[in-house]
């Protein structure tokens, strides 16, 4: 599944902090600053998704939804939450 692959790349970049990596840039500072940066991006992407939806722009909705999901995955990985834990929560809600 592509989301799991992306999640593993995010985890790797948080750990290894390769030069030029956007994820590394978001997560390199002290924990409080890193969390603030990540949460600001989630807020920004949420707003952009809402605006795209209100404007009924399908392409923008898809683009902004992908951005929101990506930054949420960065937050989860930064907080050491495994992707499988998220999937288990969806499974629990399915019942």
UniProtKB/Swiss-Prot annotation:
Name of protein: Phosphoribosyl-ATP pyrophosphatase
Domain of life: Archaea
EC top class, as a word: hydrolase
Molecular-function GO terms, alphabetical: ATP binding; phosphoribosyl-ATP diphosphatase activity
Family under the similarity heading: Belongs to the PRA-PH family.
A Gene Ontology biological process term: L-histidine biosynthetic process
Documented EC number(s): 3.6.1.31
Coiled-coil intervals: none
A single GO cellular-component term on record: cytoplasm
Keywords: Amino-acid biosynthesis, ATP-binding, Cytoplasm, Histidine biosynthesis, Hydrolase, Nucleotide-binding
Keyword Nuclease appears in the UniProt entry: no
Keyword Kinase listed: no
Annotated compartments: Cytoplasm
Main location per the UniProt record: cytoplasm
Catalysed reaction equations from the record: 1-(5-phospho-beta-D-ribosyl)-ATP + H2O = 1-(5-phospho-beta-D-ribosyl)-5'-AMP + diphosphate + H(+)
